[in-house]
Amino acid sequence: MADKVLKEKRKLFIRSMGEGTINGLLDELLQTRVLNKEEMEKVKRENATVMDKTRALIDSVIPKGAQACQICITYICEEDSYLAGTLGLSADQTSGNYLNMQDSQGVLSSFPAPQAVQDNPAMPTSSGSEGNVKLCSLEEAQRIWKQKSAEIYPIMDKSSRTRLALIICNEEFDSIPRRTGAEVDITGMTMLLQNLGYSVDVKKNLTASDMTTELEAFAHRPEHKTSDSTFLVFMSHGIREGICGKKHSEQVPDILQLNAIFNMLNTKNCPSLKDKPKVIIIQACRGDSPGVVWFKDSVGVSGNLSLPTTEEFEDDAIKKAHIEKDFIAFCSSTPDNVSWRHPTMGSVFIGRLIEHMQEYACSCDVEEIFRKVRFSFEQPDGRAQMPTTERVTLTRCFYLFPGH
């Protein structure tokens, strides 16, 4: 019965509800006459926080019986798939595609034994390995879910999810040097993402306008509806203001600004990825510095490009709270500094990122893996750079659970 389901999940329900969903649910329950106007206004008026409103709401709905509770469950499943996954709900009270996070026994039994990752030994990554990703053992998966079940992004069932990743790599340019070694990075990142369960789209040698077009098309892919996350990888020359397109020159800039990437994948423009982690990897310089044997992914900083105005920053800050969420960007260097690439071994940053993802995805969340990558750069040498995470709006830990 639906009322029994809500009783069992009451605590997690209260802890997990978001402001947008609680307001929509109140409207739905008013429209379907589960609540009258006075009851709805009382929930809003007498409770200051979302948790208090949720507690008052569920305690009002459960006594009204199974039909009222079923209306509540159906609304959540149809309007907030992330919350439904967190609660282990579906319209018929099954767990659906998401792994149930409500109680540890349900979670642990839902994990199948990890399946072998298929690799091609003839295709080495930039680190020189065979591209093997360590699988997450059943015991390790159980341990993580048991300890952090309410703080982890839910993952969809491996047999039915449709994870997508996009790689955009510019190697050839009209007016600036070729990025020798970029093919090594493409091969390594493609294998890594495939081994983590993503179907990978690779696009090469694009203008800023072409990159925008590809991003828009990617954001509208229907597969995102049945996916739990996405990765986007950009590898090109770069300057402080963004990523260089193939036609870039100091005289005629051809730049994809980082803000455009976030905007095209936010909740407004890509609702299918709402409440799902979106990881952006950027291998590009963000300033200028001389190099000798090693090449640097950098061109001269153009004075023709304007930075966002103060008004734009203020507007963006408001939007972030409502539209931009569940992002993390990992850049190969801090602002104004260079990123290094070897002509035969590929980029230093991409190589170390692949190594660390292969080694630690089985036991660490993405933010912790990125910290380990930064730690590997802690002692500077003649090719010093320091990767940095930016615009992090992940609200939960993103574990990849390779093999599951």
Curated annotation (Swiss-Prot):
There is a cross-link at residue 134 (Glycyl lysine isopeptide (Lys-Gly) (interchain with G-Cter in ubiquitin)). Residues 1-91 form the CARD domain. Coiled coil: none annotated. One of its GO terms (molecular function) is kinase binding. The two subunits are derived from the precursor sequence by an autocatalytic mechanism. Ubiquitinated via 'Lys-11'-linked polyubiquitination. Deubiquitinated by USP8. SUPFAM superfamilies: Caspase-like (SSF52129), DEATH domain (SSF47986). Pfam families: CARD, Peptidase_C14. Changing residue 318 to N: Mediates autoprocessing but is unable to interact with Gasdermin-D (GSDMD) and mediate its cleavage. Induction: Transcription and translation induced by M.tuberculosis and a number of different M.tuberculosis components; EsxA is the most potent activator tested (at protein level). Its EC number is 3.4.22.36. CDD domains: CARD_CASP1-like, CASc. InterPro entries: CARD (IPR001315), Caspase-like_dom_sf (IPR029030), Caspase_cys_AS (IPR033139), Caspase_his_AS (IPR016129), DEATH-like_dom_sf (IPR011029), Pept_C14 (IPR002398), Pept_C14_caspase (IPR011600), Pept_C14_p10 (IPR002138). Disulfide bonds: none annotated. It catalyses: Strict requirement for an Asp residue at position P1 and has a preferred cleavage sequence of Tyr-Val-Ala-Asp-|-. Heterotetramer that consists of two anti-parallel arranged heterodimers, each one formed by a 20 kDa (Caspase-1 subunit p20) and a 10 kDa (Caspase-1 subunit p10) subunit. May be a component of the inflammasome, a protein complex which also includes PYCARD, CARD8 and NLRP2 and whose function would be the activation of pro-inflammatory caspases. Component of the AIM2 PANoptosome complex, a multiprotein complex that drives inflammatory cell death (PANoptosis). PANTHER family: CASPASE RECRUITMENT DOMAIN-CONTAINING PROTEIN 18, CASPASE-1. This is Caspase-1. It comes from Homo sapiens.
